[in-house]
Every structure is written in structure tokens, then in C-alpha cells.
């Protein structure tokens, strides 16, 4: 149980770092979130490790795609990763779901809320849009 909580704590640090910083925080948050999820994954049953590693990699990819975009989107991505790791741990019997709910009451971010302030967010909200490819131009420096 302590291992799982330590992993979630590291992932939470990543979420907090993203909320406090902009572009620099995004990269740091991705690393810390991945570190926390991998920590949990390395301590769970062998068959689950691959799944947790995949979740961590996808989170890192999503955060990289966000770049300097709105931090709320990054927070939602990181929060979903933490929730996914919790669900994996609960499914393997590492922790009980009621223990996860208790941790949420003690300070972990609630789904759909920003830093437990009561400000609602849409976790499925795409905080950025990629422009159509025809808007891109190749740049060739002058010689």
C-alpha cells in the first residue's frame, strides 16, 4: 500500500508542477507523472507492468503534444493517468477501491476539479487544436 501511495504522490507532484508553471512545467510534469506511474507499475504484478508503462508513455506523448498550451489540459491528462494507475492497482488487488476514495478525500485531485478548488473542468476538453496542414509553409534560409 505504501508503494502505491508513494507512486501516486509522485504523480500528484507532476500535476502540481504543471499547474504552477507553463511550458517548462509541462515537461517537468510529464517526467514526474511518468516516474510516479512507473514506480507503481514496477511494484505491481508482472502482467500489469506493461500496461502501466504504456499509460505512462501515452501521457508523456500527450503532454509533449500540448507544449505551451493551457495548463488545464495538462492537468486533466496527468489526472487521468493517476486515475488509470489507481484502477490498475485496484484491479490487481494491490489496494481496495475504498482506499483510493479515502486518498482523494485527503488531498488528491478529484476528477473534474482543479486543485480541489471547486472550479469545474472538462477532463475530455481538448485545450489545443492543430492547424490544417495547408497553413504550414516550408522555410528555406537565404544563402
Curated annotation (Swiss-Prot):
Tissue note: Brain.
Which residue stretches belong to region Disordered? 116-143
State the name under which the record lists this protein: Alpha-synuclein
- Which controlled-vocabulary keywords does the entry list? Acetylation, Copper, Cytoplasm, Membrane, Metal-binding, Nucleus, Repeat, Secreted, Synapse
Annotated positions binding Cu cation: 2, 50
Q: Any idea where this protein resides? A: Cytoplasm, Cytosol; Membrane; Nucleus; Synapse
Q: One GO CC annotation, please?
A: platelet alpha granule membrane
Q: What is its main location?
A: cytoplasm
Q: Which GO terms describe its molecular function?
A: actin binding; alpha-tubulin binding; arachidonate binding; calcium ion binding; copper ion binding; cuprous ion binding; cysteine-type endopeptidase inhibitor activity; dynein complex binding
Q: Using the record's annotations, give every residue carrying the modification N-acetylmethionine.
A: 1
Reproduce the UniProt comment on modification after translation.
Acetylation at Met-1 seems to be important for proper folding and native oligomeric structure.
The sequence repeats are found at 20-30, 31-41, 42-56, 57-67
Q: Where is this region: 4 X 11 AA tandem repeats of [EGS]-K-T-K-[EQ]-[GQ]-V-X(4)?
A: 20-67
Amino acid composition bias (Acidic residues), ranges on this chain: 123-143
Provide the organism lineage as a comma list. Eukaryota, Metazoa, Chordata, Craniata, Vertebrata
Q: Which GO terms describe its biological process?
A: adult locomotory behavior; cellular response to copper ion; cellular response to oxidative stress; dopamine biosynthetic process; excitatory postsynaptic potential; fatty acid metabolic process; long-term synaptic potentiation; microglial cell activation
Q: Which SUPFAM superfamilies does the entry mention?
A: Synuclein
* Biological function: May be involved in the regulation of dopamine release and transport. May be involved in neuronal plasticity.
Family as reported in the entry's similarity comment: Belongs to the synuclein family.
Amino acid at each position: 500500500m505504501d508503494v502505491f501511495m508513494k507512486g501516486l504522490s509522485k504523480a500528484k507532484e507532476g500535476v502540481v508542477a504543471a499547474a504552477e508553471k507553463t511550458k517548462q512545467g509541462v515537461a517537468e510534469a510529464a517526467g514526474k507523472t511518468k516516474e510516479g506511474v512507473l514506480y507503481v507499475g514496477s511494484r505491481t504484478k508482472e502482467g500489469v507492468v506493461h500496461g502501466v508503462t504504456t499509460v505512462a508513455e501515452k501521457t508523456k506523448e500527450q503532454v509533449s503534444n500540448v507544449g505551451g498550451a493551457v495548463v488545464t489540459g495538462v492537468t486533466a491528462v496527468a489526472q487521468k493517468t493517476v486515475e488509470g494507475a489507481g484502477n490498475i492497482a485496484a484491479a490487481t488487488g494491490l489496494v481496495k477501491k475504498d482506499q483510493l476514495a479515502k486518498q482523494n478525500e485527503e488531498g488528491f485531485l478529484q476528477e473534474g476539479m482543479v486543485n480541489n478548488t471547486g472550479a469545474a473542468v472538462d477532463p475530455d476538453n481538448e485545450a489545443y487544436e492543430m492547424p490544417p496542414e495547408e497553413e504550414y509553409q516550408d522555410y528555406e534560409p537565404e544563402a
